[in-house]
Swiss-Prot record:
Its EC number is 3.1.3.-. This is Probable phosphatase VVA0289. PANTHER family: PHOSPHATASE YCDX-RELATED. Zn(2+) 3 binds at E74, H102, H132. Zn(2+) 1 binds at H8, H10, E74, D194. Belongs to the PHP family.
Length: 249
């Protein structure tokens, strides 16, 4: 499947990534993207930036190297109440918000606790996608969470880095099963490289392979085209981004 948007990438601001935004944009261009989301870790992760970093993304240009930039965050799920580590005041300055479990922030617990946290973060209405759900340390009720995501128009991320099998070990088959459940329920899918070095931005080959293998319709993959992605943002209640209107053509 052709994928034109990468919705999960990091700069050195995350504390354990190694490239600048401009370097990421250059790689995005080289890898054929139309746009990408910059989504550094929110402040509860060791080494991550203060929330002012995210609030100030309004100063970023809408295009670098001819590639559109979406202003985003990878927020941490903090607890079973589904709270995330970003003040509400930052939300208007963002185009895209992922919520993910990370072991240094949310200690792995049990299936019921993880499920409740995910349901609550979806229902909280602040996040657009759930990140790298395949991690076996954070088992959850696939059907309950994906059904809730479908009802609230929250996208399910297919994470290319996870599918390499080197991080979050044990995730790959779970990612395929999550995709199969999501297909049956009709959820929206997004795709992210989870790049921590610039050369990986836009490398979504394993995510594409999974989507094709499971038989996901491209109409349910919001990263298949810029117009689909921008339509999804508006479905989520985010205002139109005038500078990106030309990408709908």
């Amino acid at each position: 499947m052709e994928l034109k948007i990468d919705t999960h990438s990091h700069t050195y601001a995350s504390g354990h990534a190694y490239s600048t935004l401009i370097e990421n944009a250059r790689s995005a261009k080289e890898n054929g993207l139309a746009m990408f989301c910059t989504t550094d870790h929110a402040e509860s992760m060791p080494g991550a930036p203060h929330y002012w970093f995210f609030a100030n993304q309004r100063v970023l240009p809408r295009f670098l190297e001819g590639v559109a930039i979406l202003r985003g965050v990878e927020a941490n799920i903090l607890n079973t109440e589904g709270e995330i580590d970003l003040p509400l005041s930052v939300d208007p300055n963002l185009d895209w918000a992922i919520a993910s479990f990370h072991e240094p922030v949310f200690a792995p617990s049990n299936k019921e606790a993880h499920t409740q946290a995910l349901l609550n973060v979806i229902q909280g209405g602040r996040i657009d996608a759930l990140g790298h759900l395949g991690n076996p340390h954070f088992d959850f009720d696939f059907h309950a969470v994906l059904h809730c995501a479908k009802e609230h128009n929250v996208a399910i991320e297919i994470n290319n880095s996870t599918l390499k099998g080197h991080s979050r070990v044990g995730s790959v088959e779970r990612c395929y099963e999550i995709a199969r459940v999501g297909k049956a329920l009709g959820v929206y899918f997004t795709t992210g490289s989870d790049a921590h070095f610039c050369q990986d931005v836009g490398k979504l080959d394993l995510a594409s392979e999974l989507l094709d293998s499971v038989g996901i319709d491209s109409h349910r993959v919001i990263t298949h085209s810029p117009s689909q992605f921008l339509d999804f943002l508006e479905l989520r209640g985010r205002g139109p981004i005038d500078e990106l209107a030309s990408l709908r053509q």
